Amino acid sequence: MNQTNLLTTIPLRYQFPVRLLHLFAIIALASVTVTNAQPRSSQKRLTPAEPRPVSAPKRVAKTKPLTAANQRAAEKRLADLGYWTGRVDGRWDEASRQALIAFQKVERLKPTGQLTRADFEKLIAANRPSPLETGEAHIEVDLVRQALFIVDGGGVVTNILPVSSGSGKEFKSQGWARDAVTHPGRYRVREKLSGWKKSPLGELYYPVYFMYGTAIHGHPSVPTRPASHGCVRIPMFAAKRFNRMIPVGMPVIVHDGNPPPPIPTITGH
């Protein structure tokens, strides 16, 4: 039975609502057909994002802390290599710190005065430094490494101290402008004085003069960089003994890593 015959069997007063419902059904069906007929390319497909790989945290090797036994071994090793530690008694004091600074300077490490595990291992494996020159017993002042070496007649470095030489800056003294320079050259110890010596530029402790107005002397401040007016500063704890062990006339070689020229021979007419 088709739809027309079906409507004829329905009383007339019910046919209009039925036709209206039939029309709504046709419209709804058409809208669904149009929606489904849209091209698939207009519909975006959501692709789940791939998870980023998470790297495992890097493990940092822990540095083994130094023990009291390590400090005693470091102090003894410094003394064995010629660094001026004072009395080797296992106490890490100012003399020990200055000896370590001298070692760090000579080995071209950062002169912090702090004993690290890395510096301790380098110290244990280090050798006694070699002098710039051999022959007659003498003093060497290395302006580059800011260190002083006492060398015996056999060419062995017996003692090493950290120093601070001329800063290179200009200063005024007694109305004159001067440069704070420690000049490289070959000198000899001219004079030694005990105790404190007053000068226009300050006080010098147990000075050992090797050039007019220029001395190796103790000073409360010995920075790891050049900072003096031209003298060679050494730590206070070593100044008195240094003064007494160095004879007048001993050669002093001040250098910048290269041997300075020999002292010219002056002949009479």
Question: Residue ranges of each PLM-predicted region?
Answer:
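Sec-dependent N-terminal signal peptides
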Residues: 2-38
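Short acidic, glycine/serine/threonine-rich helix-capping segments at coil-helix boundaries
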Residues: 62-71, 76-98, 102-122
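Solvent-exposed, acidic/flexible segments
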Residues: 64-71, 89-97, 112-113, 141-144, ...
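Sec/Tat-exported extracytoplasmic proteins
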Residues: 78-88, 103-111, 127, 152, ...
